[in-house]
C-alpha cells in the first residue's frame, strides 16, 4: 500500500465566509473541474471549520492545513492570511 509519508498534510486555499465565533472561522473552498461525461466545466464548493489565532474577517483569502480533530467540526487550522477578495 503506497501511502503518503507521515507528517504530510493537505493544504487548501479558500475564502472566509463567517468569522463570528471565537478562534473559529468557516472557510469556503471552491473546486473547478471538468465533468467526466459531458465535459462541462463545473464549480463546486465545500465549507470547512478552521481554528485560527490570526485576525481574519469575512472576505479574506486564507490558507488552511489539515490537523488533528480539535472539536466536533474543526479538523483544519488557518496557517496563512493570503489576501482580501474584492
Curated annotation (Swiss-Prot):
| GO molecular function per UniProt | rRNA binding; structural constituent of ribosome
Q: Does the keyword Cell cycle apply?
A: no
One GO term describing the cellular component: cytosolic small ribosomal subunit
Pfam families for this protein: Ribosomal_S17 (PF00366)
CDD domains, alphabetized: Ribosomal_uS17 (cd00364)
Task: Tell me one GO biological process term.
Answer: translation
Coiled-coil boundaries = none
Provide the function of this protein. One of the primary rRNA binding proteins, it binds specifically to the 5'-end of 16S ribosomal RNA.
Report the HAMAP family cross-referenced here: Ribosomal_uS17_B
Give the protein family.
Answer: Belongs to the universal ribosomal protein uS17 family.
State the name under which the record lists this protein.
Small ribosomal subunit protein uS17
Q: Which organism is it from?
A: Chlamydia pneumoniae
Amino acid at each position: 500500500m503506497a501511502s503518503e509519508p507521515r507528517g504530510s498534510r493537505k493544504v487548501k486555499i479558500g475564502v472566509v465566509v463567517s468569522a463570528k465565533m471565537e478562534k473559529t472561522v468557516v472557510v469556503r473552498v471552491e473546486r473547478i473541474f471538468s465533468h467526466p461525461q459531458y465535459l462541462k466545466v463545473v464549480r463546486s464548493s465545500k465549507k470547512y471549520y478552521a481554528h485560527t489565532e490570526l485576525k481574519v474577517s469575512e472576505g479574506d483569502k486564507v490558507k488552511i492545513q489539515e490537523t488533528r480533530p480539535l472539536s466536533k467540526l474543526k479538523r483544519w487550522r488557518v496557517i496563512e492570511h493570503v489576501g482580501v477578495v474584492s
